[in-house]
């Protein structure tokens, strides 16, 4: 496998999908060099800058997404309609530098990968 896409489609709290996804990415980044992250649906909430997880007595692991640049992971994509549906269409709200794509181009980018793993 040359290129792997990790798709985050769940909210950061209430399940452990996001944290587990981040752990898997960090684990495989030493053997797979072309990794991209896609955020769609409630998954766009994973990368909000001003998440207040302490209000629900949860640990804020989402700030850990920032360390991905150390692992040379730089391809981050958000679904534009998912952002609009949640009232989040502003580039400065995210902890990562994301490329915001409409549904068509989001799918084109996703199809360019050899494997897709959803969290």
From Swiss-Prot:
Q: Cytoplasm: is it a keyword of this entry?
A: yes
Cystine pairs annotated here are none
Concerning Gene3D superfamilies, the annotation shows: DsrEFH-like
Q: What is its main location?
A: cytoplasm
Which InterPro entries is this protein grouped with?
A: DsrEFH-like, Sulphur_relay_DsrE/F-like, Sulphur_relay_TusC, Sulphur_relay_TusC/DsrF
Compartments where found = Cytoplasm
GO terms in the biological process aspect are: tRNA processing
Per UniProt, the keywords (alphabetical) are: Cytoplasm, tRNA processing
Query: Which top-level group of life is the source organism from?
Result: Bacteria
Identify one Gene Ontology CC term for this UniProt entry: cytoplasm
Function, in words: Part of a sulfur-relay system required for 2-thiolation of 5-methylaminomethyl-2-thiouridine (mnm(5)s(2)U) at tRNA wobble positions.
Q: Describe its partners and assembly state.
A: Heterohexamer, formed by a dimer of trimers. The hexameric TusBCD complex contains 2 copies each of TusB, TusC and TusD. The TusBCD complex interacts with TusE.
Q: Which family does it belong to?
A: Belongs to the DsrF/TusC family.
Kindly give the PANTHER family that the UniProt entry links to this protein: PROTEIN TUSC (PTHR38780:SF1)
HAMAP family noted in UniProt:
Thiourid_synth_C
Q: What is this protein called?
A: Protein TusC
């Amino acid at each position: 496998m040359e290129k792997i896409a990790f798709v985050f489609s769940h909210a950061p709290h209430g399940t452990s999908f996001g944290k587990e996804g981040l752990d898997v990415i960090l684990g495989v980044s030493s053997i797979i060099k072309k990794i991209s992250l896609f955020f769609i649906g409630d998954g766009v909430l994973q990368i909000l800058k001003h998440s207040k997880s302490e209000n629900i007595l949860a640990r804020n692991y989402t700030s850990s997404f920032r360390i991905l640049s150390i692992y040379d992971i730089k391809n981050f994509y958000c679904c534009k309609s998912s952002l609009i549906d949640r009232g989040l269409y502003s580039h400065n709200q995210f902890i990562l530098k994301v490329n915001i794509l409409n549904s068509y181009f989001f799918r084109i980018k996703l199809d360019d990968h050899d494997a897709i793993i959803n969290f």
